[in-house]
């Protein structure tokens, strides 16, 4: 009898808790609007993270979802002339191919329109702003994000977001932490509206050296620590060597490390070629990734695809793939399939979802 009473009491308590929760949820929805709180799996399954290609097949694979995630903050940093702006312009071009609206906040006042055009950027559709102060730049970003009409915003660069107080002050005045405070406030304001609007914001950043570091890495990025915490993906891009045609340097070999990734496993590395005036070499990636995936066979210095020899030496194989886009497309499809990624884009523009890793 006592056991039955205890079970009955526990049952009533559970019912009371359920009613209290239902009442609290109803009050929250009345106060903040329908959809302000819900059960994660209710009504519809969890949405797949939409991604935009980086223009590099190897980097898309390393990121785990086929590109950079939409509705998130991204940081791309590295030394000077390492390919940071080139990589972001490729992302802009890929987003424009899907019909997305892109904006470029050029705080450095150094964007080369002709180079952007060569990388596939549609200049007629690209929104560009060259703000005078850091506050103005971040207000422009905030306004564009809140509009819900922009799919991708690039800020080049965090180091050039100079606070108004520093610009109005004299040369040599100490402005301790003013840029870090500015970035911290901007991250707090932007992060919620970025998620709601599904707009990707890419911050390009520069590297500085810490003074007096004896052990460990002395490198750090500008703008304080806020961006490091709020960024879903952080990419470290480095130039590792030169590509030469006889005595002429025609490009760089570049390594990118996924330092932070909230949507897939981090710490993956990828190497690709950046050719001057051309950008990321897609054919070079197809040769290298094709060999790794077993799609392209390498015997000595010869490269073969199926029964067909495609070139002696890497540069000749690249030239063959440039001249034969159908073969290049077949190799690309097989590389993608071998990594379990569905890169196909449907009519709604949603693709690049992780299928099976």
From Swiss-Prot:
<dbReference type="InterPro" id="IPR020588">
    <property type="entry name" value="RecA_ATP-bd"/>
</dbReference>
<comment type="similarity">
    <text>Belongs to the RecA family.</text>
</comment>
<keyword id="KW-0547">Nucleotide-binding</keyword>
<keyword id="KW-0742">SOS response</keyword>
<keyword id="KW-0963">Cytoplasm</keyword>
<keyword id="KW-0067">ATP-binding</keyword>
<keyword id="KW-0227">DNA damage</keyword>
<dbReference type="GO" id="GO:0006310">
    <property type="term" value="P:DNA recombination"/>
</dbReference>
<dbReference type="InterPro" id="IPR003593">
    <property type="entry name" value="AAA+_ATPase"/>
</dbReference>
<keyword id="KW-0233">DNA recombination</keyword>
<dbReference type="Pfam" id="PF00154">
    <property type="entry name" value="RecA"/>
</dbReference>
<dbReference type="GO" id="GO:0005524">
    <property type="term" value="F:ATP binding"/>
</dbReference>
<keyword id="KW-0238">DNA-binding</keyword>
<dbReference type="Pfam" id="PF21096">
    <property type="entry name" value="RecA_C"/>
</dbReference>
<dbReference type="InterPro" id="IPR013765">
    <property type="entry name" value="DNA_recomb/repair_RecA"/>
</dbReference>
<dbReference type="GO" id="GO:0016887">
    <property type="term" value="F:ATP hydrolysis activity"/>
</dbReference>
<dbReference type="InterPro" id="IPR020584">
    <property type="entry name" value="DNA_recomb/repair_RecA_CS"/>
</dbReference>
<comment type="function">
    <text>Can catalyze the hydrolysis of ATP in the presence of single-stranded DNA, the ATP-dependent uptake of single-stranded DNA by duplex DNA, and the ATP-dependent hybridization of homologous single-stranded DNAs. It interacts with LexA causing its activation and leading to its autocatalytic cleavage.</text>
</comment>
<dbReference type="GO" id="GO:0003684">
    <property type="term" value="F:damaged DNA binding"/>
</dbReference>
<dbReference type="GO" id="GO:0006281">
    <property type="term" value="P:DNA repair"/>
</dbReference>
<protein>
    <recommendedName>
        <fullName>Protein RecA</fullName>
    </recommendedName>
</protein>
<dbReference type="InterPro" id="IPR023400">
    <property type="entry name" value="RecA_C_sf"/>
</dbReference>
<feature type="binding site">
    <location>
        <begin position="78"/>
        <end position="85"/>
    </location>
    <ligand>
        <name>ATP</name>
    </ligand>
</feature>
<dbReference type="GO" id="GO:0005829">
    <property type="term" value="C:cytosol"/>
</dbReference>
<keyword id="KW-0234">DNA repair</keyword>
<dbReference type="GO" id="GO:0140664">
    <property type="term" value="F:ATP-dependent DNA damage sensor activity"/>
</dbReference>
<dbReference type="InterPro" id="IPR049261">
    <property type="entry name" value="RecA-like_C"/>
</dbReference>
<dbReference type="InterPro" id="IPR049428">
    <property type="entry name" value="RecA-like_N"/>
</dbReference>
<dbReference type="GO" id="GO:0009432">
    <property type="term" value="P:SOS response"/>
</dbReference>
<dbReference type="InterPro" id="IPR027417">
    <property type="entry name" value="P-loop_NTPase"/>
</dbReference>
<dbReference type="GO" id="GO:0003697">
    <property type="term" value="F:single-stranded DNA binding"/>
</dbReference>
<dbReference type="InterPro" id="IPR020587">
    <property type="entry name" value="RecA_monomer-monomer_interface"/>
</dbReference>
């Amino acid at each position: 009898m006592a056991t039955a009473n205890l079970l009955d009491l526990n049952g009533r308590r559970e019912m009371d808790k359920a009613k209290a929760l239902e009442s609290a949820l109803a009050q929250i929805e009345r106060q903040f609007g329908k959809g302000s709180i819900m059960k994660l799996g209710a009504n519809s399954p969890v949405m797949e993270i939409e991604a935009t290609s980086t223009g590099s097949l190897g980097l898309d694979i390393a990121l785990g979802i086929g590109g950079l995630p939409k509705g998130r903050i991204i940081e791309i940093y590295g030394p000077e002339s390492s390919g940071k702006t080139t990589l972001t312009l490729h992302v802009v071009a890929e987003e424009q191919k899907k019909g997305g609206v892109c904006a470029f906040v050029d705080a450095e006042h150094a964007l080369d329109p002709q180079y952007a055009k060569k990388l596939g950027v549609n200049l007629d559709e690209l929104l560009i702003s060259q703000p005078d102060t850091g506050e103005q730049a971040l207000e422009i970003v905030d306004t564009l994000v809140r509009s819900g009409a922009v799919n991708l915003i690039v800020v080049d660069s965090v180091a050039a977001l100079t606070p108004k107080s520093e610009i109005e002050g004299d040369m040599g005045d100490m402005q301790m932490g003013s840029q870090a405070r500015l970035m911290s406030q901007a991250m707090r304001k932007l992060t919620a509206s970025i998620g709601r609007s599904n707009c990707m914001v890419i911050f390009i950043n520069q590297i500085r050296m810490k003074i007096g570091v004896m052990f460990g890495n002395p490198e750090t990025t500008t703008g304080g620590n806020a961006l490091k915490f709020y960024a879903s993906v952080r990419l470290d891009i480095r130039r590792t060597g030169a590509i030469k045609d006889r005595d002429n340097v025609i490009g760089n070999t570049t390594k990118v490390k996924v330092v932070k990734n909230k949507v897939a496993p981090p710490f993956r590395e990828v190497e690709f070629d950046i050719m001057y005036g051309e950008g990321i070499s897609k054919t070079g990636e197809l040769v290298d990734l094709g060999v790794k995936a077993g799609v392209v066979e390498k015997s000595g210095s010869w490269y073969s695809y199926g029964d067909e020899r495609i070139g002696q030496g890497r540069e000749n194989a690249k030239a063959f793939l440039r001249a034969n886009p159908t073969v290049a497309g077949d190799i690309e499809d097989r590389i993608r399939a071998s990594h379990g990624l569905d890169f196909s884009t449907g009519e709604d523009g949603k693709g690049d979802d992780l299928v099976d890793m």
